[in-house]
Amino acid sequence: MAAQDPRTKFKTTDYEKQEQEVPGLQSEMTPAPDCGETSYQGNQRLQGYKMLVTGGDSAIGRAAAIAYAKEGADVAINYLPSEEQDAQEVSQVIEESGQKAVLIPGDIRDEQFNYDLVEQAYQQLGGLDNVTLVAGHQQYHDDIHGFTTEAFTETFETNVYPLFWTVQKALEYLKPGASITTTSSVQGYNPSPILHDYAASKAAIISLTKSFSEELGPKGIRVNCVAPGPFWSPLQISGGQPQSKIPTFGQKTPLGRAGQPVELCGTYVLLASEESSYTTGQVFGVSGGVQID
């Protein structure tokens, strides 16, 4: 039997408690998330494609960007300037895969930057075939009184508004056959009481995915969503979870462990590729068995 037991394929023992300031750096995590730097093997399923990935410096966005490159695509990634160290690592992997890497730092909470981001990606890549929206903000609070208006606003200004602005601009360049991939979460279906704003923002992304798909399907553009479960990432150790939950993070899933970002590569590649030519408006759960409905 060639397949590995999914319960033990990756780390199953407790993680070390570790805390970073927002947004967190993958390069300073112990252990570093596996984003497919050496573990993902491509098969030229996206040869010639031009891709834009937000949040492409670490964890899920990094895994998508690396997988796209290993499948033959040129990739532009967006990230915060403070994440330059992680972004440079991604750029190196993309270039070692024989593909073009375009780095576009900036804060997606700035509306104009989102328009400029798409324009720069299109110009520097020489086209645009897929936009993958991963960048997100997550901060836990112990109870409802901890969720200030400012906290809610920051979450939606990071998780929801940029998605809308980026898609608006990208439609100037996306042709029939192109695709958009959004990133929600199991929190969009099973909200945690310590993540009211984050969960609500992820539910909004599911709704936008479906409404976008209704509008853009007749134009030949597919829109789908990935809903990850608990994945080991800088998001968790920079205030996304209480420190008390870090050691056993992900262990309550049916598979008994947190996911590694590389385990999302296949889903992002599938949704961007011709293999999903009849798939739009769908949400794909990659959750270790946590149910979405």
What label would you give each PLM region?
Residues 172-173, 214-218, 277:
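Alpha-helical segment proximal to the catalytic Tyr-Lys
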Residues 14, 110, 115, 123, ...:
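Conserved mid-core segment of classical short-chain dehydrogenase/reductases
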Residues 29, 37-38, 268-269, 280-293:
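Short C-terminal tail/terminal secondary-structure segment
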Residues 167, 201, 209:
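Active-site helix of classical SDR
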Residues 84, 105-118, 149, 262:
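The beta1-alpha1 cofactor-binding region of Rossmann-like NAD(H)/NADP(H)-dependent oxidoreductases
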Residues 129, 145-164, 181, 205, ...:
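Catalytic Tyr-X3-Lys loop
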Residues 185:
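Residue(s) in the substrate-gating loop at a strand-loop-helix junction
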Residues 218, 230-253:
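A glycine/serine/threonine-rich, flexible loop-to-helix segment
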